[in-house]
């Protein structure tokens, strides 16, 4: 029977740390194949944070193909085909019912996911599967002792997908974090560029016109791009909705100072 380890995640984007973990579990003989289950939309994440699902899958496909074990590390679209929202137990149940005769499934997850596991749908059923957990640097994993296996010597990277997205948005180098094919795909598609991020936030604001955090995030993006007028408009909108919003007030004051300095008439102080 083939042993298949399922690595669930949004992979937004997939980075070298994800692939290093997949290579590790295969090379350590913990499974015959590692499969990256690309989530269409996490029940615990805002939809606006995610790149389109097929973009995330294609990046995962490129990263897996460039791994040391391309025949044994693969991505899957199975959760794209199941009813939404996507929950881990539903995917496990579907795979077991349809492939359990020839495959034995286990799960790979991070210690941060394990900490939240008891909030997941039917988490006790999930614990019936073998679970392998990779801790963060220097972290002790104490939850569900005896029901999980901690991978103490798993390879860990000092960055996350969140950091990768932030660096892309700021135009910083990500070559040490991403496979070259993934980086090229992101550049070609314009994923997580400032323009793409602004468009996503604007669409989300249209759907949630009183969400102060969305205006704040877009305002900070305008601020980083030196778009002072647009930034001030967003921060003022936040203060209209919530006069006690300290972060928006601080940013609005900083923008006002920049505008006053820029347009001050030095001949008529």
Where are these regions (language model features)?
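Alpha-helical linker/edge segments of TPR/alpha-solenoid repeat scaffolds
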Residues: 197, 254-269
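Nucleotidyltransferase catalytic core that binds NTPs
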Residues: 1-197
């Amino acid at each position: 029977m083939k042993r298949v380890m399922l690595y669930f995640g949004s992979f937004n984007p997939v980075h070298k740390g994800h692939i290093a973990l997949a290579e590790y579990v295969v090379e350590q003989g913990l499974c015959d194949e590692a499969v990256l289950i690309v989530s269409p939309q996490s029940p615990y994440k805002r939809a606006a944070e995610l790149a389109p699902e097929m973009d995330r899958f294609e990046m995962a496909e490129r990263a897996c193909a460039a791994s040391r074990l391309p025949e044994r590390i693969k991505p899957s679209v199975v959760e794209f085909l199941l009813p939404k929202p996507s929950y881990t137990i539903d995917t496990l149940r579907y795979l077991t019912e349809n492939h359990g005769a020839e495959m034995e499934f286990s799960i790979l997850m991070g210690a941060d996911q394990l900490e939240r596991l008891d909030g997941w749908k039917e988490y006790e059923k999930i614990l019936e599967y073998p679970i392998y957990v990779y801790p963060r640097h220097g972290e002790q994993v104490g939850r569900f002792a005896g029901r999980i296996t901690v991978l103490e010597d798993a390879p860990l990277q000092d960055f996350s997908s969140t950091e990768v997205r932030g660096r892309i948005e700021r135009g910083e180098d990500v070559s040490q974090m991403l496979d070259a094919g993934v980086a090229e795909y992101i550049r070609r598609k314009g994923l997580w560029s400032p323009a793409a991020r602004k468009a996503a936030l604007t669409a989300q604001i249209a759907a949630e016109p009183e969400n102060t955090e969305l205006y704040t995030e877009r305002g900070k993006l305008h601020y980083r791009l030196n778009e002072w007028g647009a930034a001030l408009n967003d921060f003022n909108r936040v203060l209209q909705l919530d006069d006690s919003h300290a972060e928006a007030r601080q940013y609005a004051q900083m923008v006002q100072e920049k505008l006053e300095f820029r347009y001050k008439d030095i001949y008529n102080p």
